[in-house]
Amino acid sequence: HAEDKILMVDLDMIPVIEKLIGSCPKIAQVIILTDRKNMPETALKNILCYEDLLSEQSGNFEWISGDEREACGICYTSGTTGNPKGVTYTHRSNVLHALTVTNPDMLNLSSNDKVMPVVPLFHANGWSVGYSAPLSGSSLILPGREMTPQALYEMLETGVTITLAVPT
């Protein structure tokens, strides 16, 4: 329903996307988050490698100005409280959420913290910590796909001070 034309994919997700790409007729370009030398064999057509695209740029990026109320991203909900839907976030809402999370009455993040979100990155606690942790100087521990009890325990043992999760 978003009618996206470009899909950016982590290496771990290539097998999943290979199975699903046929039901996504609007996707014209797949960008894999790697470089060509680390790109595995794939049945995906018309792929580009993200790191190669970056290395081809001059480095003289010219920032554009925009309205803080413009959408900067869209996340899809799984429908926990209703039908699945796309939710747009504005530049302003992302900044305000990151600032709010660092406040003493919220997470009170500081450079002494190690933050580990165990929620998906499309969850508000997942995407916002990607902004609030660097803003406060906190370390950010990303568990990745290894969400077994043993793996989480080992990550917590590294000195994690704040874990973000969902109570359900």
Describe the residue ranges of each PLM region.
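Structural core segment of the AMP-binding/adenylate-forming
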Residues: 1-52
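Short beta-strand->loop structural element characteristic of the AMP-binding/adenylate-forming
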Residues: 1-19, 86-88, 117, 139-146
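Residue-level detector of structured alpha->beta connecting loops
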Residues: 3, 25, 58, 159-161
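Short aromatic/basic micro-patch
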Residues: 8, 47-48, 65, 88, ...
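Adenylate-forming
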Residues: 9-20, 36-37, 119, 145, ...
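Short hydrophobic/charged patches on amphipathic alpha-helices used for structural packing
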Residues: 18, 63, 149-153
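Conserved adenylate-forming
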Residues: 57-70, 74-116, 128, 138
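Conserved AMP-binding/adenylation subdomain of ANL enzymes
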Residues: 95-114, 122-162
